[in-house]
């Protein structure tokens, strides 16, 4: 049809928004570094984002990864170099080793789930919470800090933080972990478009290419280009 012959950016105006699953944790520096370009991409292609906060320590343990403290010193040192490179590349100004990091992200990630559960937009909170960790060195394991961040985002902070500690939110958090494993996601950020995983904020440009071209998703057995 006519819509199918148009550029993908124009096509998006003729149909329901494409969906993308966004697996992340507020604990992750890479999710923070990639968040602004990801949001820009979402706007450009009119994507519907399915936000999936996930507990990284569990995801790592089940997929062969290691938390930072258990990695070889060579890998730890290289990570600091990469953070500096991407800090410059993305035009950011953040601490490589912020005072209150690492932290238990269950409550902070749970606030995002609670926001979604309430039918609200998590973006205003995320756009405050990410820099709160990496630029302002705030403690996102502290309930009062989370309440203020949510309030500043125009959200009911106290109610959301209370809800974040509930069994229902914990169950949703666990379900996100299982969904991540089922999707083939093993770190943060993980972007899943039509079943194709893009791991890491340094894959955003490749995600852009996939959206721009309108190509079929690639698979691990090389069938991405085959016709139906």
Kindly label every feature range from the protein language model.
Residues 26, 32-133, 218-225:
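Structural alpha/beta surface segment adjacent to cysteine/selenocysteine redox centers
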Residues 1-15:
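Short, Lys/Arg-enriched N-terminal segments with co-localized hydrophobic residues
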Residues 15-17, 59-62, 76-78, 90, ...:
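Generic detector of short, locally flexible boundary/turn motifs and exposed helical patches
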Residues 8-10, 111, 115, 177-180:
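Short, charged low-complexity linear motifs
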Residues 18-21, 26-47, 117-120, 124, ...:
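C-terminal cap of thioredoxin/glutaredoxin-like
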């Amino acid at each position: 049809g006519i819509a199918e012959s148009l550029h993908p950016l124009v096509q998006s105006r003729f149909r329901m928004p494409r969906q993308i699953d966004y697996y992340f944790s507020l604990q992750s520096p890479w999710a923070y570094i990639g968040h602004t370009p990801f949001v820009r991409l979402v706007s450009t292609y009119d994507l519907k984002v399915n936000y999936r906060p996930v507990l990284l320590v569990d995801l790592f343990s089940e997929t062969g990864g290691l938390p930072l403290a258990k990695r070889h010193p060579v890998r730890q040192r290289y990570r600091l170099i990469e953070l500096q490179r991407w800090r410059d590349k993305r035009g950011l100004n953040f601490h490589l080793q912020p005072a209150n990091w690492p932290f238990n992200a269950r409550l902070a990630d749970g606030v995002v789930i609670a926001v979604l559960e309430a039918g609200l937009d998590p973006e205003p909170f995320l756009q405050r919470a990410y820099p709160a960790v990496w630029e302002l060195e705030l403690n996102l394991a502290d309930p009062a800090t989370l309440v203020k961040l949510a309030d500043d985002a125009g959200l009911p902070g106290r109610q959301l933080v209370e809800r974040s500690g509930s069994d229902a939110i914990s169950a949703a958090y666990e379900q996100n972990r299982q969904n991540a494993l089922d999707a083939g996601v093993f770190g943060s950020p993980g972007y899943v478009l039509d079943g194709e995983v893009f791991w890491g904020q340094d894959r955003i440009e490749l995600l852009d290419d996939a959206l721009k071209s309108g190509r079929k998703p690639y698979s691990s057995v090389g069938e991405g280009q085959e016709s139906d």
